[in-house]
């Protein structure tokens, strides 16, 4: 039971911090990895990992494929919204559309998979900590904790981004570069979480609001809480 408890704590930590970062830098209270398509891309990467023979054999290929899927989703959404001068509404809309596309591709993978593969993928998509063991904990702990510490280090920049791109530029911060870097870190964290627990939605949406009502809106205090 101890690996599952540790896994639940790590996944909750990762999703909550990723959601808090996305809500702050996008200035949108509904932003989180699930609604922006990051979780959908990670799930698609894991689904591909489960059906490709040489990937399914490797034990630690799931976190890698989940990170790649999440990163590709972020790149697609970022490329679409950059044409509209990075409108927050267009970013959220693009993320939701991409999430539906990823879900459709996962269903397409289901239709061409074997019954045993479908069973394992359905069990994974429902979200579960039953298969977590110590080797998996060791694999995800280092990148997840490192990602959270990096976000804590950039907490001041995240707070400045909440003022808007123009004011952030006047304060010596390059908004687009910082935002792109933060997207990569949140993709890494989300990929690690999805790889071990499957699709768990709305943790990254609810927890930042709950903790914000307790410790306030400052990013450093919010991440530590």
Segments from the language model and where they lie:
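Alpha-helical transmembrane segments in inner-membrane proteins
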Residues: 1-225
